[in-house]
Amino acid sequence: MSRRHRAEKREINPDPKFGDLVVTKFMNAIMLDGKKSVAESIVYGAFEAVQSKLKQEPVAVFHSALDNIAPHVEVRSRRVGGATYQVPVDVRPERRQALAIRWLIAAARKRNETTMVDRLCGELMDAANNRGSAVKKREDTHKMADANRAFSHYRW
């Protein structure tokens, strides 16, 4: 790890339609090969589909989905005297958001619908209702941390 200065946090602009920074981060995470307009059309298309199906504000559904996916604790490996322990640690708020976004996109990409708009819409609605594979991933992470609670005194 470099001993020089840390990379500065880049400032990102809120998305043009909703004026939300988290939506912009989500778009940037969906984007492949620098194709921002494609990522925008996917996200906005999924939001429109959510609004037509649920008759709710799509950004509110998106934020509740992220809250339901974001983990509170995770396990990190810690080597102590020849043995490696999975030590449960609290997750920082920035990392919680990043993990939630990453897990939501991964779960959406694994779904069986034909277009990414449909997959993302389905996963957003599932996550907002505490269902879906992204929420399952969070539950598994919490179970793993709970199972290794005995090693929590190895925190750093």
UniProtKB/Swiss-Prot annotation:
GO MF, one example: tRNA binding
Organism: Sinorhizobium fredii (strain NBRC 101917 / NGR234)
Protein name: Small ribosomal subunit protein uS7
Family, similarity comment: Belongs to the universal ribosomal protein uS7 family.
Stated role: One of the primary rRNA binding proteins, it binds directly to 16S rRNA where it nucleates assembly of the head domain of the 30S subunit. Is located at the subunit interface close to the decoding center, probably blocks exit of the E-site tRNA.
Subunit description: Part of the 30S ribosomal subunit. Contacts proteins S9 and S11.
CDD domains: uS7_Bacteria
UniProt keyword GTP-binding present: no
Keywords from the named record: Ribonucleoprotein, Ribosomal protein, RNA-binding, rRNA-binding, tRNA-binding
An individual GO BP term: translation
GO cellular component: small ribosomal subunit
Origin superkingdom: Bacteria
Pfam families: Ribosomal_S7
UniProt keyword Ribosomal protein present: yes
Gene3D superfamilies for this protein: Ribosomal protein S7 domain (1.10.455.10)
